[in-house]
Amino acid sequence: MIEAKDKGCQTIVEATPLGLGRDLEVLVECSKKSGINIITCTGAWDGANVRGKNVPKAIRESTIDEITAVWTKEFEEGIDDTGIKPGYIKLALGDEGEIFPLQEKILRAAARTSKKTGKVIQCHIWEASSLPKAVQIIEEEQLPYDRFIWVHADGQMDMDKILEFGKKGIWLEFDTLGGAVDFTKYPQAIRKLQEEKLLSQLLFGQDSGSYWIKEDEE
């Protein structure tokens, strides 16, 4: 991080929610020692086909309104007794081509929290076929499209869906460049977004921040 600071990095958007290893003490220490601002999040992560494994029990057993109340309180008062407030809502869902009930619940809670707080939803959706259902849900919750970021929009590079939902107003995040073997699809996609006047909705990130421990290390 110090090296990143020296190269001009000022802020890191840190996307680890509760249940996936969020550690505020570590984030505070890293921020102080590096001089980089770190934006933490609230939310829940149910990607990678793990069926709720990384979603805390309290969220799994709570109603939409109960989850909304907890997340809203974190934005208004801070997380637990730390005084640290998250900057956005992080979700992961839909990696099996459909959105399961738990995933729908956290998405609706996120939409309601966003409406109360004005905070954006950063939503991991690798399987592009799940996006229409996710957008339908936020439409039912009457959430403005520009409060929703489609993380891994470049995962399958489904240009039909990228253009369709980009035109609705959602944010499009390209973040798999770090592990890409073929880079030719990126300039082609970016050129198409430019032609459709959607470049202002394109975000770039690096999806390389996770460390998955082995079963025998848990």
Report each predicted region and the residues it spans.
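Active-site gating/metal-coordination segments in enzymes
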Residues: 29-32, 37-120, 171, 176-180
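Glycine-rich, N-terminal phosphate-binding loop and its surrounding beta-alpha-beta segment
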Residues: 2-25
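Active-site core of metal-dependent hydrolases
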Residues: 116-184
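Active-site beta-loop-alpha junctions enriched in small/polar residues
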Residues: 17-18, 43-47, 94, 126-128, ...
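Short acidic/histidine-rich active-site segments
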Residues: 122, 175-176, 199-217
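Short acidic/polar active-site loop segments enriched in Thr and Asp
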Residues: 10, 87, 200
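Histidine/acidic-residue-rich catalytic or RNA/ligand-binding cores of hydrolases
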Residues: 24, 49-52, 130-137, 158-166, ...
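Acidic (Asp/Glu)-rich catalytic clusters
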Residues: 2-6, 27-35, 75-84, 112-115, ...
